Amino acid sequence: MSEKSLDFIQNQINNAKFVLENYTKNKSGFVYSSRNIFVLIDKYVEDFLSNTENERWIIMPGLRGAGKTTILAQTYTKLNNTNFDSRRLLYIPLDKAVNTLGISLLDVLNAYQSFLGEKFENLSEKIVLFIDEVQADSNWGNIIKTNIFDVTDKVMVIITGSSAVALQAKNNADIIRRSRIEKLFPMNFCEYQIIKNSKYPIAKLKGKIKEAMFESENSEEIFSKLSLLKKDVNKYWSNIDDLEIENYITTGTFPFTVNKGQEKVFDNVNNQLDTIINKDIVELGTFDVKTLKSIKRLLYILADISDAISYAKLAKALDTNHVTLANMMEVLEKAEVLIKLSRLGSNLSKTTSFSKYLFMSPLYRASLLDVTGKINVYYTRQGKMIEDIIGSYLYREFVSKNTGSLEYDYASKGADIVLRLKNKKDIVIEIGRGDKSFEEPLATMKKLGSQIGMVICYKTNELKFENGVVKIPLKYFLLS
């Protein structure tokens, strides 16, 4: 047992409260609003302590900047403000322990048991552990399973980490069987309004809009159901400036960017992308220095293109081969920086030859365009940024839950996105900044025999049904 490990535990017990409070409120004492996932994580803790449920291992992976540490801080702070014994509440910033102090997760757990004077298998009272940036110790899964989960039911562990953590968990049968994974994605519009303006959504409206758009049998049914919600939709938007949509699309998808200047946000996000490449992606794949540098160049190219691009052209632009490029694309998908849409309706649909890529957050696209000096083409790329928003939503709600897949129609008059649900339903989606025609979705609907086509438009407030296609204002979609 090293003295360094014991000092670390003592410091965390004494000071974590003050460190984490900085994530929950500003210098004036104003308490920040929480994201939707906080309610879920808090419920897991309450159920564990009350013996209602026995979910004892919660894994919360997500992109850098999505607010993982803040969720831990809010959960820790709420519990610490009760009569729960603060000695049995431990926050572990594992990246600091491993990278700065040179102590492993196992060292930390052993030191904590020494501090308590109890082994985990002989605990008299329950404990809640918060482990931040768990990927700092590559053996985290086996350590938690062997030293906590398999020896006691009186310890709950809530961990955060990069997208690599989710992949490691899914590929380990022991972890996936024992844990619950709750991914943290970029903020939706309603979360953005909660965080920025303390503007809360209308009860049950989100579920009703989602049900109308994705559980209806045809476009006319979508139109009918959404028409019934018009009053509530208008009520929500009644005191929100339309510029808030543009602010959200450009800089509002991460909590740390809210109320910050655009240039500062772009600089921070570009630094964040560098960290993802140099740390998270290194954990997901084996690349030499030249290839790692090419990944950022690849992102610059993808930010500026308007549609699908062949791998041959990309490989030539990056002076690399097809295999290396395919590996680069795959690792950016695994890191959840990019969302892949396969080509619809051919043997190529599951290959990478002509895949289309969206960004998990439009802020990535805007920040990359800013670096290349092309932010002045913002309005010509705003349609793609709206597509990023919609693609990210569909990924979160369907792809990540394994209930659907995303494709696109490569034809010149084909639709932007096809959501292919596991129930064999195809939903054809066309997206635009201005007023779009019905031509593209109709062509793709005919090709697929689909009864559901929608056009989602930013610059329109009119809900409309025509020729088997429903036109939906972006204002409706953002509330789903």
Please provide the spans of the model-predicted regions.
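A short, basic N-terminal segment
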Residues: 1-55
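Conserved lysine of the Walker
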Residues: 68
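Hydrophobic positions on the alpha1 helix immediately C-terminal to the Walker A/P-loop
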Residues: 71
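Short glycine-rich substrate-engagement loop in P-loop NTPases that contacts/grips substrate
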Residues: 90-124
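Conserved Walker B catalytic segment
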Residues: 134-158
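Structural recognition of the conserved hydrophobic beta-strand(s) that form the central parallel beta-sheet
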Residues: 155-162, 183
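Interdomain motor-coupling "hinge/lid" segment immediately C-terminal to the ATP-binding subdomain
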Residues: 172-291
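Accessory nucleic acid-recognition modules appended to NTPase machines
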Residues: 253-415, 421
